[in-house]
């Protein structure tokens, strides 16, 4: 994020305030693990942003989600893999936390990868351990749902984070 150099709220410099609220790598990982919805911005065919909200999971340490292969976001990502993702939470100013990830989407229709991401996302959505999903017989349902989907992994190139509870 660019720093304007102008004093921020409370009279401090923007750079100092930004450093104060930036999450550490450990805080970022904990934040991503604790949340489950991400806003995904792709580049539409006319160059305008296309936004959608999806459930996600961390798979191999990377933000990942699955989506219908024919969805606008999947079509956009095949044409132009640039993506910005936003995970945020909090209601009041002092509670606001967020992580913006700008990067490249790596999309695959490999059935095993789609199943792996689908299982992780389903576990995150339901609050159920992946092993328990498998034991409950969810694998077949996830594989059926995955036939029309692709898995998307986000390769981070730039991030910005904030945690107003640090103020």
Segments the model singles out, each with a brief description of its role:
Residues 2-23, 93-167:
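Charged, gly/pro-rich active-site loop segments
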Residues 14-42:
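Short, conserved active-site entrance elements at the starts or edges of catalytic domains
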Residues 32, 76-77, 121, 154:
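A generic structural signal for nonpolar/aromatic side chains embedded in well-ordered alpha-helices
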Residues 34-35, 79-80, 148:
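Structured helix-beta-strand junction loops
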Residues 36-69, 77, 84-88, 97:
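Short beta-strand segments
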Residues 38, 63, 83, 105-106, ...:
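Short beta-strand segments in beta-sandwich/barrel cores
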